[in-house]
């Protein structure tokens, strides 16, 4: 809600990290404030790509991917040496210092390679950081907001990106103001989901590079037309 938040999306250092983690094409999944108030309890450990099906045995019948939700995952009882690829990445912009007392983010180091959903009793560490820090996480990392037992708030901005095969948390094609779209360049339009990816997301021609909300579409045709 403002140019400063749009400018954050083109921060060169951050974008280099996201390019490295996700590749040439990716979408903005969410871009929002995270304010932890005094008395807030710790969040349950989670990943930012919990919806990603995990590898399973050929002879096993897995839970259909469309039946997964935040409380119901597919779990193969036989451990696998294979893990799901990284398809999401998260940026935590530290607006107020992160500490052990004010809700600094809890992280389980190395958990991005575990290949499973978080254990509730996993040992975590607090990502302490000064104001002005940006913390970049692999989307598979087990993490969660810590408890705020201090007298002050802990403010941050959370920005999540995902690869174009997946559905973003926020629908920027419908939720972006026209004034923002009118000034948006190719990079921002691609982040918002207006770029056609390998013929996916098109309205008419799969050869077009971008779609626009005001694009003319072919409507019902009649024999006399």
Language model features by range: what are they?
Residues 1-69:
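Non-heme Fe(II)-dependent double-stranded beta-helix
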Residues 3-10, 84, 127-128, 150:
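Aromatic-acidic/polar surface patches that form glycan- and anion
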Residues 31-33, 91-93, 157-161:
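A structural signal for short, well-ordered beta-strand segments
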Residues 31-33, 94, 110, 139-140:
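Short, well-ordered beta-to-alpha junction loops that form the rim of enzyme active sites
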Residues 37, 95-97, 161-163:
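Non-catalytic surface loops within mature trypsin-like serine protease
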Residues 41-129, 167-175:
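Catalytic core of non-heme Fe(II) oxygenases with the double-stranded beta-helix
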Residues 112-136, 140-141, 146-225:
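Conserved double-stranded beta-helix
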């Amino acid at each position: 809600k403002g140019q400063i938040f749009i400018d954050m999306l083109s921060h060169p250092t951050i974008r280099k990290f996201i390019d490295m983690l996700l590749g040439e094409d990716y979408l903005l999944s969410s871009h929002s404030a995270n304010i932890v108030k005094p008395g807030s309890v710790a969040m349950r450990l989670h990943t930012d790509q919990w919806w990603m099906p995990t590898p399973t045995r050929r002879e096993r019948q897995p839970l259909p991917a469309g039946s997964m939700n935040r409380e119901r995952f597919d779990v193969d009882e036989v451990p696998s040496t294979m893990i799901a690829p990284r398809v999401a990445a998260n940026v935590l912009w530290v607006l107020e210092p992160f500490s052990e007392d004010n809700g600094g983010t809890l992280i389980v180091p190395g958990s991005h390679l575990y290949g499973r959903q978080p254990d509730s009793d996993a040992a975590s560490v607090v990502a302490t950081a000064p104001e002005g820090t940006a913390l970049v996480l692999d989307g598979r990392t087990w993490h969660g907001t810590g408890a705020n037992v201090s007298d002050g708030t802990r403010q941050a901005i959370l920005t999540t990106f995902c690869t174009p095969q997946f559905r973003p948390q926020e629908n920027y094609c419908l939720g972006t103001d026209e004034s923002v779209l009118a000034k948006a360049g190719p990079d921002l339009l691609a982040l918002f989901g207006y770029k056609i990816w390998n013929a996916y997301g098109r309205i008419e021609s799969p050869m077009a590079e971008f779609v626009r909300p005001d694009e003319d579409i072919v409507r019902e045709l009649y024999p006399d037309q």
